[in-house]
């Protein structure tokens, strides 16, 4: 029995270590929210999940060290819902950042960003007047456009050099006018009309060389924030997927070890417990994978139906809470 308790304790220790990248991802998003992304939403669920995994793992370690069956059971019970929440949250992040990206521009290395290329819940949140008032102020106060200026040995950057810079989505959308407006480059944040506008882009009239205004009220700036959010969320989601896979494997092994500990407490034959150990791991792992797979497929199909019949915000809410309930 002691060896199985040690196994559960070891798994809890590795689970504790896995909470570090989740918590780190939340802290990284929080730092981004205070600089360029400026949307304070996604980081808090990640931070809460990371802290929850840490606390639950410590409880599991204590249960394994003192052979406390209740703490072992509490670890398995709560960890199931934490894993389900992390899976649902990761899927939610992918769904809301599914659409939209920058457009390639001829003779430019950077991309231009257009709000019409984005849709769904995240776009509605960013473009909401109440939210954008705070987001726009955050982008301006972050000084991202002040930092865009460059010079080479004291010589200001030329237009040709600027056109072949790899600008971030926020720099491209908020710090310069859209390319199709036909403005002429003076420096990185000063542009003058250089010809007729190409296409009816309302952002052309919103551009202002006042460094406090620039294009912070342009649709391209909102699209740039969306593009930056998509990149940040996708990076963290990749880490979450890897962590989830490892967590599920650890969870299944811990379940099998806990079942054997229960058998020991119930005075069941040791040999029988050992013989069924591998079979139990295989069947439990298969059962959980099948449940998660069919749950995801069903809820994705249901979410697609909701998008067709209802608005995106309602559909995403149903998807997220429906997945956690199913799990």
From Swiss-Prot:
Subcellular compartments:
Membrane
Side Cytoplasmic, residues: 1-6, 65-75, 257-287
Write down a Pfam family by its short name. Answer: Tetraspanin
Key words of the record: Glycoprotein, Membrane, Transmembrane, Transmembrane helix
Q: Which residues cross the membrane?
A: 7-27, 44-64, 76-96, 236-256, 288-308
Q: Does the keyword Transmembrane apply?
A: yes
Q: Which residues lie on this side of the membrane: Extracellular?
A: 28-43, 97-235, 309-327
Principal place where this protein is found?
membrane
Please list the residues annotated as glycosylated: 34, 187
- GO CC, any one term: membrane
InterPro entries, A to Z:
TET_plant, Tetraspanin/Peripherin
Q: Which GO terms describe its biological process?
A: auxin-activated signaling pathway
UniProt keyword annotation of ATP-binding present: no
- Membrane topology, from the record: Multi-pass membrane protein
What is this protein's function per UniProt? May be involved in the regulation of cell differentiation.
**What is stated as this protein's family in its record?**
Belongs to the tetraspanin (TM4SF) family.
What protein name does the entry list? Tetraspanin-4
Q: Which organism is it from?
A: Arabidopsis thaliana (Mouse-ear cress)
Q: What is the lineage of its organism?
A: Eukaryota, Viridiplantae, Streptophyta, Embryophyta, Tracheophyta
Gene, per the UniProt record: TET4
């Amino acid at each position: 029995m002691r060896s199985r308790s040690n196994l559960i304790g070891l798994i809890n220790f590795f689970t504790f270590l896995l909470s570090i990248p989740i918590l780190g991802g939340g802290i990284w998003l929080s730092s981004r929210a205070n600089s360029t992304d400026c949307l304070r939403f996604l980081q808090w669920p990640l931070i809460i999940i990371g802290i929850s995994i840490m606390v639950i793992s410590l409880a599991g370690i204590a249960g394994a060290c003192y052979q406390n069956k209740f703490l072992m059971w509490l670890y398995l019970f709560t960890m199931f819902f934490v894993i389900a929440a992390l899976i649902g949250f990761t899927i939610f992040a992918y769904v809301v950042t599914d659409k939209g990206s920058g457009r390639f521009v001829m003779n430019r290395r950077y991309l231009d960003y257009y709000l019409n290329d984005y849709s769904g819940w995240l776009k509605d949140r960013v473009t909401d007047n109440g939210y954008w008032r705070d987001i726009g102020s955050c982008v301006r106060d972050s000084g991202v456009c002040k930092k865009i200026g460059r010079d080479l040995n004291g010589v200001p950057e030329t237009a040709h050099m600027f056109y072949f810079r790899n600008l971030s989505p926020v720099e491209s959308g908020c710090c310069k006018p859209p390319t199709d407006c036909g403005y002429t480059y003076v420096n990185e944040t000063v542009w003058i009309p250089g010809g007729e506008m190409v296409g009816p882009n309302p952002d052309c009239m919103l551009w202002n060389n006042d460094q406090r205004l620039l294009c912070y009220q342009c649709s391209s700036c909102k699209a740039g924030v969306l593009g930056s959010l998509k990149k940040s969320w996708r990076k963290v989601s990749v880490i979450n997927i890897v962590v989830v896979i490892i967590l599920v494997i650890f969870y299944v092994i811990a379940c099998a070890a806990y079942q054997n500990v229960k058998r020991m407490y119930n005075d069941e034959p040791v040999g029988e417990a050992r013989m069924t150990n591998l079979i139990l791991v295989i069947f439990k792992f298969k059962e959980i994978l099948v449940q998660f797979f069919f749950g995801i497929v069903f809820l994705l199909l249901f979410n697609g139906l909701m998008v067709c019949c209802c608005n995106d915000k309602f559909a995403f809410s149903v998807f997220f809470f429906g997945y956690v309930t199913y799990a």
